[in-house]
A protein has these predicted regions:
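Terminal targeting signals and extreme-terminal segments of soluble enzymes
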Residues: 1-315
């Protein structure tokens, strides 16, 4: 399982070709920016064949959440490997933007080197599917399945408007962090809350949170950052708790709803708006449904995860 923890802001991922090396950020359009996010989600090709590519990567302690790395951080790392794997295993014949990513978190890896084994499950002219396994010394840590596709011709229908909230603050910075237990990954996040009560104060308001968010180091929004954002806010059930808790993610699905970048020269400092809702906490499990919008109201991504609501261990 991958984790999120107590930190929150106040309202107001035939032949063998060997290319060993140190993980480096991809040169693909989704990863041209430099900075901590691209450095710490970087992958390096170790070997490949017609149907498989194996990458080296490094799990950084800077993205820790609770007892393990942040789930959205691992999602971005896996998505980067899957995107690279599509190009490598099909020799560039299959293209398309990521449309769906599902991850099951098996074990929380400690910081250090890992491998990501990407397999081409199906290559189509329009839609391709790949799987990936994050592992260390042969032990699986996470399993992923992703679909990539070019746009299809269909009527444009939208019935999911951007919530009526105040625009982003003029100064690009986070709201006040409320709790000293805020995990390390929050240092990489800009969060300006707009929806939801203060966590861990036993609110009776709906389990709904939302706010403007982005990476602390300005970087154009792309599929990799959206994978991270899909798990970046504190869990909505935290609003109902009276004590800090943690919420390990069992599985996470992200649907990418538009091709990125949407313009030729995207603003690296632009924030997007994310809203997450929970309806049921039962037998320790809860669902979390999310939507991420661009500032012009375009839906960029939707997400859903199953997580476990847990109290922090007593010290």
């Amino acid at each position: 399982v991958a984790e999120r923890q107590a930190g929150a802001a106040a309202p107001d991922t035939p032949g063998t070709r060997d290319t060993p090396g140190t993980p480096v950020a991809s040169d693909t359009p989704d990863a041209r920016a430099s900075g901590a996010f691209d450095r710490d989600t970087a992958v390096a090709l170790e070997r490949s064949s017609d149907s498989e590519a194996v990458f080296a990567a490094e799990v950084s302690s800077d993205w820790r959440a609770g007892r393990g790395p942040h789930g959205g951080y691992l999602a971005a790392m896996l998505l980067r490997a899957l995107s690279e794997g599509l190009s490598i295993t099909t020799s560039g014949r299959s293209t398309g933007a990521p449309r769906s990513l599902t991850i099951h978190y098996l074990r929380a890896p400690d910081p250090g080197p890992v491998q990501i084994r990407v397999k081409l499950e199906r290559a189509g002219r329009s839609l391709s599917t790949l799987s990936a396994q994050l592992e260390r010394n042969g032990t699986p840590l996470a399993l992923a399945l992703a679909a990539f596709s070019v746009p299809w011709s269909a009527p444009e229908i939208a019935d999911l408007p951007l919530p009526d909230v105040a625009p982003p603050d003029p100064v690009r910075e986070s709201g006040r962090l409320l709790h000293p237990a805020a995990p390390p990954f929050t240092r990489h996040l800009i969060l300006q809350p707009r929806i939801g009560a203060v966590p861990f104060e036993g609110s009776e308001q709906p389990m709904e949170i939302g706010g403007w968010l982005g990476l602390a180091e300005p970087r154009p929004v792309d599929a990799l950052s959206l994978a991270f954002f899909s798990d970046a806010l504190f869990s909505p059930p935290f609003l109902r708790l009276h004590e800090p808790g943690t919420s390990p993610t069992v599985d996470l699905t992200v649907h990418f709803r538009t091709s990125l970048p949407r313009v030729a020269d995207p603003d690296p400092g632009e924030l997007c708006f994310a809203r997450f809702r929970t309806g049921i906490v039962h037998e320790g499990f809860f669902e979390e449904d999310g939507v991420i919008w661009a500032q012009d109201g375009t839906v960029l991504a939707q997400s859903r995860q199953l997580a476990i609501l847990m109290a922090l261990p007593k010290r």
